[in-house]
A protein has these predicted regions:
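Conserved small/polar residues in nucleotide/adenosyl-binding loops
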Residues: 215-222
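A short, small-residue-rich loop immediately preceding and capping a beta-strand
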Residues: 81-120, 129-137
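A glycine/threonine-rich phosphate-anchoring loop and its flanking beta-alpha core
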Residues: 110-207
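ATP/NTP phosphate-donor binding region
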Residues: 1-88
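Short glycine/serine/threonine-rich phosphate/pyrophosphate-binding segments
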Residues: 16, 41-42, 71, 96-101, ...
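Predominant activation on well-ordered alpha-helical scaffold segments within soluble catalytic domains
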Residues: 20, 49, 60, 75-78, ...
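ABC transporter nucleotide-binding domains
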Residues: 210-214
Length: 226
């Protein structure tokens, strides 16, 4: 069995402010990738801004990430990143900003690919991207510690994972950010997490880590019966 998870993870209340100096190693100018509202409401965006300011790092904010972000959106963001001379990215939000940030970092580091985003993102020819830090504000997707990025492809009328594997360099996991989530969002993201556990439980390629899924499935069952 071989395991590879290069993301450096900080976990706990206030972990962004306590460990914000870690962002210094990623670059000098950031693009914060997020949505319109939730990151402002739950305080995660403010925490990231304060950390960057304390480090003396400049930044721009791209807050146009929609649910299930499209190839077109990440191409627009990448174009702005190139113009603004961004050299690293901070994703703030759920799976959508985190997945988008990975794709944006790849395109921004390869400007000639921006006008051919579908072709380059879904072609196996290797591409290197800029560093990414992730600040998840929901449970479920796990995108902060996986190499995958799923985008909406309007040309094919479907969602599809890009061909490139790109891990976040840093992840700041503060469970306090979920407190302001709506009931509907909380339910959907918890079901997402449960689905991942079931996937592991049913996986025919079992390994030594599969018992972890059994433990958490039993925990879900216990809570459901309370």
């Amino acid at each position: 069995m071989r395991l590879y998870m290069p993301t450096k993870v900080f976990f706990g209340s206030g972990c962004v402010s306590e460990n914000g100096a870690e962002l210094k190693a990623l670059g000098s100018r950031a693009m914060i990738v997020t949505g319109k509202h939730s990151s402002r409401i739950n305080g995660s965006l403010a925490a990231v801004e304060q950390a960057l300011q304390a480090n003396g790092q400049t930044y721009v904010i791209f807050d146009e990430i929609e649910e299930n972000p499209s190839v077109e959106t990440v191409a627009v963001a990448a174009g702005i990143a190139v113009k603004e001379q961004v050299d690293f990215f901070v994703a703030v939000g759920g799976g959508s900003p985190m997945d988008a940030s990975k794709a944006i970092s790849l395109l921004a580091a390869n400007p000639s690919a921006i006008d051919h985003a579908e072709e380059r993102l879904y072609h196996p020819e290797p591409m290197q991207g800029y560093p990414v830090a992730a600040v998840p504000t929901t449970s479920g997707t796990g995108s902060e510690v996986t190499p995958y990025a799923i985008l909406t492809r309007h040309d094919l009328h479907t969602k599809q994972s890009i061909a490139h594997k790109w891990f976040a360099d840093l992840a700041f996991v503060d469970a306090g950010y979920v407190k302001t989530s709506s009931y509907e969002n909380m339910v959907s993201t918890c079901v997402d997490a449960l689905a991942h556990l079931i996937e592991s439980y049913l996986n025919t390629n079992a390994n030594a880590y599969n018992p972890v899924s059994y433990t958490h499935l039993r925990a879900h069952e216990t809570k459901a019966n309370l």
